[in-house]
Every structure is written in C-alpha cells, then in structure tokens.
Design a protein with these regions (language model features):
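Extracellular-facing segments of soluble proteins and assemblies that are Gly/Ser/Thr-biased and enriched
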Residues: 95-179
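Short, low-complexity, disordered segments immediately C-terminal to signal peptides
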Residues: 26-36
Length: 278
C-alpha cells in the first residue's frame, strides 16, 4: 500500500495486513542517474516538485514501503524523478499477503489530512509506462491506490485500486463491468470491477504496460452505483507495484514515465445584471 506522508496512513498499515493475494515481475528499464536511493523498510525519496503530477496540496514522494516484512526480504529503491524510478526486490516465495508497495504519490486534500470533494474536479487523468514482465516466480501487480474521504473531511470513506498489469493476483468477488475513456486522449476500454474485502478494484481484462486512465468517471461510477458515499472526496493517489513474492530472487520493477493531471471545475462566469423594462 501507499505511504503518502499523511498522518492518517497509519490506517493503511492496518488494512494492508489483511490483504492476502497472489501476486508477476519486472524487467529492468534504461539506466539513468539516481538522485535518491534507499533500502530502508519505509524509506522515502522526496519531496519532489514534479510538474507532471498536479495536485491540490503537498509535494510528491516516492516510497520504498515494505508493509509486511518477512524473513529474508530485501528491497531497494532508486529514484531519478517521480516519473522515472526502479525497485529491486527479493522476497521469498510463500503464501504471504502483499509484502510491499513501492510507490509514487501524494495528497489531494485542502490539507494533508483532508480530501477534496469529487464535485470540485472537472477531470483526473493519468498516464504510465512501466516494465513488469511476469514469470512463474513472481507474484505482483502494477496498480493505482486511491484513498477517499467524506467530502472535505478527514473521515475515510473508501479505497479504490486500478490494476492494469498483473499476474497471479488472487481472486476477488466480481461485481460488474463498465466502459470508460474517450476523452483527454484516453482510449475507450472496458474494465471489470471486483471487491476484495473493503477494497474496490478496477481491473483490465488483459495486461497493459503503457497506457492512460480516466480516473474521475471511474470514481463517480462507484458513487452513482452505491459503492462509495455520495459525498466522497479525493484524499490521496499512489502508483506502483504491490509485491507478494519474487520467488527468493532479485527482480526489477521499472517506471519509465508517469503523470497525473487534475483540472478543477471552472467557476461559473458572472452574469450581467438584467435591465428593468421601461
């Protein structure tokens, strides 16, 4: 799961402990100079002022989150910028929950501990390019992790994941299918919705390592169909790989390009005063 520099993310650590799933692997990308490296369990690179990721508040961080460490784990993070970074992970095989979620992310509330109502957004687009070439040894998936609050408050209302590249990522309860895209350069695609505990998961039917996502209508669909409260607001967005196992060997996960673009609703233009007839 995501560590996004918000105090309420103690909740994430509690919830992730219950996330049990299988999890595919990554190939190395091009070598680029790193400005930050860390192998600490919860090591953080940042803050970055990265114009390709727009938000309401806070800076962008890249985190080496290891939420459920097991004996023998090793994971190192090497960051050039929030859109180009890589992780080398060595996590023993076994029927384990998600061990780590190396990820880039930040907050979208008016403060670090609040959310921004979805009604205040005109669009939320994101694009990605990553390498995760699955083998039989690794259990992992590339995913957005989106946390929502109630209106502009700090009260948590839900967690939504968007998975687009995965292998052996466990079973979840199928709920529905829906089609999104067609604006902002995002292709029209059909997604499957399933539920895993308290988590709502949008999944592409087939893997995609380069693409774009129209996030706002996916969240509004969940509100309209009763999966999220009507007053839901955007709290935080993370993006990375949830890793369960690499089979006890070193595997590389590479992010080559990443962006999030948010556009607020434009205020209504002032109307000219009406003239009295006379």
């Amino acid at each position: 799961m995501t560590s996004l520099k918000i105090s309420a993310l103690a909740l994430v650590a509690v919830l992730i402990a219950g996330l049990v799933a299988g999890c595919g692997i990554a190939a190395p990308g091009r070598s680029t100079p790193a400005v930050c490296t860390t192998s600490a369990q919860k090591g953080t690179c940042g803050p970055f002022n990265y114009p390709q990721i727009t938000r309401t508040t806070s800076s962008t961080y890249v985190n080496n989150n290891v939420w459920n460490p097991i004996p023998g784990w090793r994971q190192s993070l090497s960051v050039t910028n929030p859109g180009r970074w890589r992780v080398t992970a060595n996590i023993p095989a076994g029927n384990t929950p998600v061990v780590s979620y190396p990820s880039v992310g930040g907050n979208y509330g008016q403060t670090n501990d609040t959310s921004t109502p979805l009604s205040e957004y005109a669009s939320i687009y994101s694009s990605f390019s990553e390498n995760m070439n699955a083998t039989s040894k690794t259990s992992a998936w590339a995913a957005y992790d989106i946390w929502l609050g109630q209106g502009s408050s700090a009260n948590w209302s839900g967690e939504v994941m968007i998975q687009h590249d995965f292998a052996d990522n466990g079973a979840c309860t199928f709920e529905a299918t829906a089609t999104f895209g067609g604006s902002g350069g995002v292709p029209v695609q059909t997604w499957n919705l399933c539920q895993f505990g308290s988590e709502l998961v949008w999944k592409l039917p087939s893997n995609e390592q380069v693409g774009s996502v129209d996030i706002l209508p996916m969240l509004r669909w969940l509100v309209t169909h009763g999966y999220l409260p009507a007053n839901s607001g955007l709290w935080a967005i993370g993006y990375g790989w949830e890793i369960c196992s690499t089979g006890g060997v070193n595997e590389k996960f590479q992010l080559n390009r990443f962006s999030i673009t948010t556009t607020p609703v434009s205020p209504e233009a002032p109307q000219a005063p009406s003239r009295a007839a006379g």
